[in-house]
Curated annotation (Swiss-Prot):
Protein name per UniProt: Tyrosine--tRNA ligase
Location, primary (coarse class): cytoplasm
Function text: Catalyzes the attachment of tyrosine to tRNA(Tyr) in a two-step reaction: tyrosine is first activated by ATP to form Tyr-AMP and then transferred to the acceptor end of tRNA(Tyr).
Lineage: superkingdom: Bacteria
UniProt xrefs under CDD domains: TyrRS_core
UniProt KW keywords: Aminoacyl-tRNA synthetase, ATP-binding, Cytoplasm, Ligase, Nucleotide-binding, Protein biosynthesis, RNA-binding
Pfam families in UniProt: SYY_C-terminal, tRNA-synt_1b
EC number(s) reported in the record: 6.1.1.1
Motif 'HIGH' region: chain residues: 39-48
Amino acid sequence: MHSLIKDLKARNLINNITNEEKLIKALEKNKGIYVGFDPSADSLHLGNYIMIMLLKRFRLYNIKTLALVGGATGMIGDPSGKSAERNLLDKTILEKNIAKIKFQLEKFTNSQVINNYVFYENMTFLDFLRDVGKLININYLLEKEIINSRLSVGISYTEFSYNLLQGYDFLQLYKNDNIAIQAGGSDQWGNITTGIEMIRKNLGDDNIACGLTINLLTNSEGKKFGKSEKGAIYLDENKSTVYEMYQFLINQSDADVEKLLNFLTLIDVEEIKKIMQAHKNNPALRVAQKALAKAVVVDIHGQQKYEQALHISEVLFNGSISTLNQEELEIAIKSLPATKLDKDEIKIIDLLNLANISSSNRIARDFLNTGSILINDIKINDENFLVKKQDAINQKFSIIRKGKRNYFLILWNKD
């Protein structure tokens, strides 16, 4: 068994392989691997990061890697895993998304990046029917789960054709770019096998085209990885701050962290076992979560940004917000639940209720009497205390802390 396949299996990454013998042969012949990325948003997110890391794993073994941006397929929308028709993206938005996704893929994967629109820009509809449609039988498509599951509720010819486009992508890359392996999530099996069938029909049985799918990364509750309560954690720090990403990772459960270390980092499998043993010896230290957060954040945003996120976390949970500089403070408040005020002052009890920090006057008084409430690092005990805009940080916002770890942002009205 090839040592790369051995590593992927040890990490429990592999869901299925179309033909392991061909996969080994492709690796031995230095054939490349590609992964497709959907430009449905203007940034990749942590869920996509699994496939980015897969490309990095192959690069460690000097295997050619290619990232394919779906400029053409993105105009249609992949029906895989969808129970209803997808809305078509506006072309202007799609082009902006493609440019941003391409930039991220070049940055994070260090791979060749191709927009699959180049395969179709000069192809007429009649060309498509003759050169692509003739390669695949309708019955073959109808048997696929991604299409069959939609027949009862309906599927447009547009989405029905998606499978052919992704299959044709594989054929083009196999013929022209020395690519013999396609990888994707477990929901991509049907699309991958269509490409292999097209290659067989076009080039004969003596080919080494193969595919592998990666296990869906879900948490212990069965939910897809990569989303916080506020939504997806994006790789673009303008959409999700580095601090938000760090907090998302550091707060992963003990039940999930070993799987995440295997899926999302290049840390050696044996080293992960040692990390988990150290974690089990003293779970309160969160050794495994810290290793996960450091590995992922450093890989995506760099050491300096990681250290900044770590510093913000340590200050918010153990120190004083007054020690944060302006940049760090602005990063920190982006992740806090916010309440806007259109007045210049408010009673503390009313504010606690308004910001959903307490659910009643009685509970608000209890928080105050037990010294649980701090505003901009100042403990408030007086239930008649007036919170004023003039005392806010830069007269723009106040930060309320309840207990040791719960922070809330108050945004004051502009003059």
